[in-house]
A protein has these predicted regions:
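Membrane-embedded alpha-helical bundles of polytopic integral membrane proteins
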Residues: 1-124
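Short, highly charged low-complexity linear segments
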Residues: 23-24, 121, 128, 155-163, ...
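Juxtamembrane helix-loop transition sites at the ends of transmembrane segments
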Residues: 31, 77, 104, 155, ...
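Acidic (Asp/Glu-rich) catalytic motifs at the cytosolic membrane interface
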Residues: 52-68, 72-73, 81, 128-170
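Hydrophobic transmembrane alpha-helices of multi-pass small-molecule transporters
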Residues: 91-92, 162, 169, 178
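Juxtamembrane boundary at the C-terminal end of a transmembrane helix
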Residues: 175-187
Length: 187
């Protein structure tokens, strides 16, 4: 029964998170606070994806080169605190830069300082969720005593590992946008 429950939980985890994350692509255009933030599906997806890629790449390469302190050795023995910090910093810098380059944020808005703080905070939060998603996928793999979810990308955790970070960060982004929109509509 434990195996059946674990299998069902994994399917629900992957299915729900994938559904929410892909819902980002179909977000209708949102103009929060009239001039500060303008979101749509494509811009939102690119914003989240840029954070995922930057976080994953910097965490991996800085962790390999400079990582001395293990982050969660029982779940993922190769991940380091140094890599995690570097990944988070890169995620914030790349995410914030992407938001401005794609004109998600209007740099000429009167309340630009507040907007920058919000984008920095959101980028930091999403970068952390990227790493949490990766750890959750690693925990699931450890629970089933498998190294890779598939052999499509040998040595790289398999097909789900290419998407776990994006899916986990995506669900949080989607929920934050939806809650923010509801709060602003009620204000």
């Amino acid at each position: 029964t434990k195996e059946v429950f674990g299998c069902l939980a994994s399917l629900v985890y992957a299915g729900l998170i994938f559904g929410y994350a892909m819902s980002i692509r179909y977000l209708k255009p949102i103009n929060l606070n009239q001039t500060l933030v303008e979101l749509n599906g494509v811009k939102s997806f690119i914003y989240v994806y840029s954070i995922v890629v930057a976080t994953d790449l910097f965490a991996y390469f800085i962790g390999i080169k400079f990582g001395k302190h293990k982050l969660c050795p029982e779940i993922s023995p190769k991940k380091s605190i140094e890599g995690s910090i570097a990944g988070s910093i890169a995620g914030v810098v790349v995410g914030t830069t992407t938001a401005f380059l794609m004109k998600i944020v209007n740099p000429e808005a009167n309340e630009i300082f507040l907007t920058v703080l919000v984008v920095l905070g959101l980028s930091a939060f999403l970068s952390i969720t990227v790493q949490i998603g990766d750890l959750i996928a690693s925990k699931i793999k450890r629970g089933y005593q498998i190294k890779d979810f598939s052999n499509l990308f040998p040595g790289h955790g398999g097909i789900l590992d290419r998407f776990d970070s994006l899916l986990y960060a995506g669900i949080w982004f989607y929920l934050i946008v939806q809650i923010t929109e509801l709060l602003l509509m009620g204000a």
